[in-house]
């Protein structure tokens, strides 16, 4: 009589739970990870003059995934009572009940703890800065209830990897990093306004505030101005960091990508606005390639 072979596959309830946590972290939609990762890579390559320490690089790539995931978890916790009223978010795990609010909070804390353990392998300056990053990640989701400029807080959170990367790689915070920081904040406000434009009608019904609502009919011109200012700030940062021709070319290409995004949102159609938001991944990549090529040439 042969013994019954036990299946090594996870049970359906376990599999459903794992999938729910992955969705809570937005691992099925990694665009947020990419948009935080690109400025991080820019900063590491500039700070290290083209050759980041491998351990610092690994710490920051993992840290970006963990902190972006933590931000998504606390965002869904904060929005759990309103997400059911928005078509795009109605199937999130906290809305459907696959994950409870208590489980979400515990998971958020766990992600922060793991990220902090990684930071402990850097230096005291980076460790100190990490508390600011955690605070920004926690605060952003709640800003949508109190200000029509929550995208600025999001930009501050997304750009926080810049000072942390310089601190980890060089143990210094040169003044020029704040020019690059400002550029990323401006860029983030622009592309997250596109994201908010896709949800504007639902947000108006449920009372959620955003720059898309604040800007109103002037949204296209204001986002275009934000993109232009972001490019100018990037160019200024590039001059201060001694970046050359390749970087300048990358900014010209980024400007062309911004122009295409403005074309996409011309009719303010929600799906097109969301496409414009997603398209910013290419902007981050192009700027990184400009920095990478510049460092390869100069070194």
Curated annotation (Swiss-Prot):
Cofactor(s) this protein cannot do without: Mg(2+)
PROSITE patterns cross-referenced by the UniProt entry: UBIA
Membrane topology: Multi-pass membrane protein
UniProt cross-references to InterPro entries, sorted A to Z: HB_polyprenyltransferase-like (IPR006370), Prenyltransferase (IPR039653), UbiA_prenyltransferase (IPR000537), UbiA_prenylTrfase_CS (IPR030470), UbiA_sf (IPR044878)
Spans traversing the lipid bilayer: 31-51, 54-74, 105-125, 148-168, 177-197, 241-261, 277-297
Naturally occurring in which organism (per UniProt): Saccharophagus degradans (strain 2-40 / ATCC 43961 / DSM 17024)
UniProt-listed GO biological process terms: ubiquinone biosynthetic process
Function: Catalyzes the prenylation of para-hydroxybenzoate (PHB) with an all-trans polyprenyl group. Mediates the second step in the final reaction sequence of ubiquinone-8 (UQ-8) biosynthesis, which is the condensation of the polyisoprenoid side chain with PHB, generating the first membrane-bound Q intermediate 3-octaprenyl-4-hydroxybenzoate.
Protein name in the entry: 4-hydroxybenzoate octaprenyltransferase
Catalytic activity: all-trans-octaprenyl diphosphate + 4-hydroxybenzoate = 4-hydroxy-3-(all-trans-octaprenyl)benzoate + diphosphate
Gene Ontology MF terms in the entry: 4-hydroxybenzoate polyprenyltransferase activity
EC primary class: transferase
Originating gene: ubiA
Highest taxon of source: Bacteria
